[in-house]
Amino acid sequence: MQVLHVCSEMFPLLKTGGLADVIGALPAAQIADGIDVRVLLPGFPDIRRGIPDAHVVSRRDTFAGKISLLFGHYNGVGVYLIDAPHLYERPGSPYHDTNLYAYTDNVLRFALLGWVGCEMACGLDPFWRPDVVHAHDWHAGLAPAYLAARGRPAKSVFTVHNLAYQGMFYAKHIDDIELPWSFFNMHGLEFNGQISFLKAGLYYADHITAVSPTYAREITEPQFAYGMEGLLRQRHLEGRLSGVLNGVDEKIWSPESDLLLASRYTRDTLEEKAENKRQLQIAMGLKVNDKVPLFAVVSRLTSQKGLDLVLEALPGLLEQGGQLALLGAGDPVLQEGFLAAAAEHPGQVGVQIGYHEAFSHRIMGGADIILVPSRFEPCGLTQLYGLKYGTLPLVRRTGGLADTVSDSSLENLADGIASGFVFEDSNAWSLLRAIRRAFVLWSRPSLWRFVQRQAMAMDFSWQVAAKSYRELYYRLK
């Protein structure tokens, strides 16, 4: 079984979000599981630099200009790169310029990604041809459409990491990207009068996966589906929509071996975690005190992530004696709000605007509770890191958060399945109730330690996801 992942980023070569973490870990787990997996990526500069052994395997003249297909290896995984400097070698992010405007030719840049994914199944590399093309998010959404146009030379899987991003472009570009006009209708890639790369993936793929079972159910409902609920409900009824939970890359996220921590620890040596807390309190300008619970946020500062709720609930958290350490960037209003809180409550609130991968490890190793109060969350990795590090997640019951965290209710404590704190409604009062429950558990140190050990014993390894995908691929054959 040969499988090609088609996507736009891969950790640690290039990362703008959780998609990169998935592609940085899943292929290696699948190779260990016995699948011959390779990855196809655009030749962005950071990716090119990270794979210096890449060599040319094919050259083509395409609708987007002349390209070369390169092949190399990264961490034991075979990686194809689309070498097209006129499309991919630019300042700014992979998707927009330094002024945050989307590149005007994104329709070509990412149509090409899908096209090459399809051409791989048609023999673009004469020595390797995938049985399954596995496309990820809107950037790769046209791969299943091109496969359909070519008579489906391979099976296709499309994974939705976040349905909110739909890859919308003017209808006139259908000629530019060399797809038939017959595809431009509601039973195809048309959405609200435009081309939707996301809908192309959803409509033409043989199977759709979402990154958690709960998110797979949620996206069949109007409040989560962004207008795609009819199609997704149909795919669910056909048995062509399922959820496969993301995993944790234990080579990178493990408190036992994490070199970024001041003190490494296991579930049997949790007392060693205290030194990480002390170091984090010093680094964030907080009062050094191991008797108070240290809450943390590592997130984009957006309303989707529920960070406005944290700001609203913060006075209640501080009144009960808690501390907050925040690392993140995003909405300027939220940034200013948290910076103002830090200025008003020195020693109790510490804020770093920006994102630093290394410092996020130090926060995870030092905090007591990680806050993830998202309004929606397809999977979420932050809470998985929290579980792994014995930093109890406090989450809203949605998407992957609902699948991975069990509330520390009396019943769950008795059954030995409690692993954090869960609240239902997306408002500050509901969040504060969960914060209050965290303080109550904190006041019972032996019970707190019991829940930490439960959380750290949970298995969210990529091997579990790899097995689920292997079973799916073989069902499609």
Curated annotation (Swiss-Prot):
Recorded GO cellular component terms are: cytosol
Pfam families membership: Glyco_transf_5 (PF08323), Glycos_transf_1 (PF00534)
Keywords in alphabetical order, please: Glycogen biosynthesis, Glycosyltransferase, Transferase
Asked if the record carries the keyword Transferase, the reply is: yes
> Which named protein is this?
Glycogen synthase
Sorted alphabetically, which InterPro entries does this protein's record hold? Glyco_trans_1, GS/SS, Starch_synth_cat_dom
What Gene Ontology molecular function terms does this protein carry? alpha-1,4-glucan glucosyltransferase (ADP-glucose donor) activity; alpha-1,4-glucan glucosyltransferase (UDP-glucose donor) activity
In terms of NCBIfam families, this protein maps to: glgA, PRK00654.1-2
Biological function: Synthesizes alpha-1,4-glucan chains using ADP-glucose.
Q: In which pathway does it act?
A: Glycan biosynthesis; glycogen biosynthesis
Q: Where does ADP-alpha-D-glucose bind?
A: 15
Q: Which family does it belong to?
A: Belongs to the glycosyltransferase 1 family. Bacterial/plant glycogen synthase subfamily.
> Kind of enzyme, top EC level?
transferase
Question: Could you tell me the EC number(s) of this protein?
Answer: 2.4.1.21
One Gene Ontology BP term is: glycogen biosynthetic process
This enzyme catalyses: [(1->4)-alpha-D-glucosyl](n) + ADP-alpha-D-glucose = [(1->4)-alpha-D-glucosyl](n+1) + ADP + H(+)
Q: Sorted alphabetically, which SUPFAM superfamilies does this protein's record hold?
A: UDP-Glycosyltransferase/glycogen phosphorylase
